[in-house]
Amino acid sequence: MRALLLNSSPHGEASHGYRLAKEMVGTLDMQVVERDLVADPLPPISKSYATAVTSGNHHGGVFDWSERVIREVEDTDLLIIATPMHNFTVPAALKLWIDHVLRINRTFESTSTGKVGLMRDRPTFVLVGSGGFHSGERARQPDFLTPYLRYALESIGIQSISFILMQGLVGGDASVSEALSGARSALSRHVPFNRVAPVTA
C-alpha cells in the first residue's frame, strides 16, 4: 500500500496542513511518497506541450513531467493534498500540478456529455488551511477552492474526496489549536485513519 502526499504550501514542512497530514499518514502501515510542489516546482506548461495536446503529436519527451506526476497518482492507494487557500482558490503551485495531471486521452476523455475520468478512484483527502473563514457561521469570504478542486479530481475519475478545513489560522495559538484539533478529529472518522488509535498530541 502506498500513499502520495502533496504539499503546496509556501511554508513547506512548517505548514500546519502538511504537519497534520504527515502525522496522520504516519499512523498507517503504508509507504509514503511526498512531493513538495513549492520547493520542487513543476515546469510551466509550454507552447510545445500545448501544441502536442491539440495536435496529437507526442514525440520529443514533451509529456515527461506530466507522465511522472500522473504515474505518481496511479501508483498510490491514498492521495493526500495539503494546501492553503490563496485568494479564494488553489495556490499557483497546485494549479500547475492539476494542469500536468489533467490531460485529454490520458487521464480523461471528452464525450458528448462531458469529461469522463480514466483513472482509478482512490480515497483522497484535501487538507485546506486558511487564515480566515470561508465555511460555517463565521465565513466572510467565498470558497472557490473546494468546488474547483473537486470537479478537477472527479473529471479524471477520483470520486472519493474529503475536504478537511483548518480555518482561522492567523487568529493566534488558541485558534490554531482549535483548527488542528477539529481537522484531526474529522480525519480520524474516515477510512483508513479510523482504523488506528487517534493521535491527541
Question: Which role fits each region the language model picked out?
Answer:
Residues 1-106, 185-201:
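N-terminal beta1-alpha1-beta2 submodule of the flavodoxin-like/Rossmannoid cofactor-binding fold
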Residues 10-11, 131-132, 168:
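Short, glycine/serine-rich, charged loops/turns that create anion-binding
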Residues 76-77, 122, 158:
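Short, well-ordered alpha-helix to beta-strand connector turns
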Residues 82, 127-129, 165:
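Short beta-strand segments
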Residues 104-109, 158-160:
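Short, structured loop/turn "capping" segments at alpha-beta junctions
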Residues 110-155:
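Short, glycine-/small-residue-rich phosphate/pyrophosphate-handling segment
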Residues 136-201:
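Glycine-rich phosphate/pyrophosphate-binding loop and the adjoining helix
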